[in-house]
UniProtKB/Swiss-Prot annotation:
NCBIfam families: serS (TIGR00414). Catalyzes the attachment of serine to tRNA(Ser). Is also able to aminoacylate tRNA(Sec) with serine, to form the misacylated tRNA L-seryl-tRNA(Sec), which will be further converted into selenocysteinyl-tRNA(Sec). It comes from Trichormus variabilis (strain ATCC 29413 / PCC 7937) (Anabaena variabilis). It is found in: Cytoplasm. One of its GO terms (biological process) is selenocysteine biosynthetic process. This is Serine--tRNA ligase. Its main location: cytoplasm.
Amino acid sequence: MLDIKQIRENPQLIQERLNSRSGTYDIQPILQLDKQQRELEATRSQIQARSNEIGKIVGQKIKSGINPQDPEIQALRDEGNSIKAQLSELEPREKELKAEIEQLILALPNLPSDSTPIGKSEEENVEVRRWGDEYLPQNPNIIPHWEIGEKLGILNFERAVKVAQSRFVNLIGAGAALERALINFMLKTQTVAGYVEVSPPLLVNTDSLTGTGQLPKFAEESFKCADDELWLIPTAEVPVTNLYRGEILAAENLPIYHCAYTPCFRREAGSYGRDMRGLIRLHQFNKVELVKVVHPSTSFDELEKLVGNAEAILQALKLPYRVINLCTGDLGFGATKTYDLEVWLPSSGKYREISSCSNCFDFQARRADIRFKEAGKKGTQFVHTLNGSGLAVGRTMAAILENYQQPDGTILIPEVLQVYLGREVL
């Protein structure tokens, strides 16, 4: 959530930064309503001051011995009653204006950072580095992961469709075991790196989704329970970040690092026709998420560390990947800066996103009211929040099924996973 004071004091800069994003955003309605609200507030304050003055005068006159029924006192009381009537009309309108302003601001995305490349689409993203060229598979006839998975009997899409609908998968035998091994390996790696594991609720309330920025703008992309004001989580970022909603944290307890494994649920509205086959874009998928709550002065350094934590998984699995600095037009709603990690999928000859690591600055903290206080200092400040995948489990499986695929159709198991599976080949 953007700061209304910042919008008010730097309207041209704010509008320019918003214009660099995809989509159309106009802050003029906010400025107009803000002007009305501030004028109304000033009027109400003046009237309230006069009401307080009248009360004081009346009290002094009565204390001095003047009869309470004196015409002068009665006139003051009549004026006071008139003021109360005015206040009863002004206060609801002021609250209404504040609510309208808040809803308009909630619809605005975060401002891109100065180090985010300017661009309107993913074609203008900037590649930062590549890793693992020496691990690129030499097999020229890679079978797509969904085909080899079904051939090996570890993936079944047809029965998942029967149970649910399209864009679901059933993992069987070694497929389910491989997924579990990946989850355990990812969590172990991140807890060793200093993250504290949490197992959060998979259903969250509206305030939680609003706090992290999915609501109100992206309601159609989430699954909502029909009879409850609860939503299935699209990512563990939502419940983990909101663990601290409405709290004032001690500065000495920052930074806070959490990792969490959860299933995630997304409608994928508007993506029909894209990645309809395989494990890339499902309605339900598993993910290990990394969340940081940090001091504002360290958030960009923490972003680099976060990317390194996600990269550590890919490097341990010896999966070729690249790091992309997203341009302003491809930036997520709540992010000020994002790096995507894209893993190599040889069947398509493309790098595909497997992790998105973002610094949300104070955007989520303002929405969720997460603050911190430094010992011996007055007042509080908003924390900065960060999140990233460490990693998307299904996409990691897809990358293994393709990059470790052998000419005879078997799949070598990455060395770091063999201890979890007790085997070397699928």
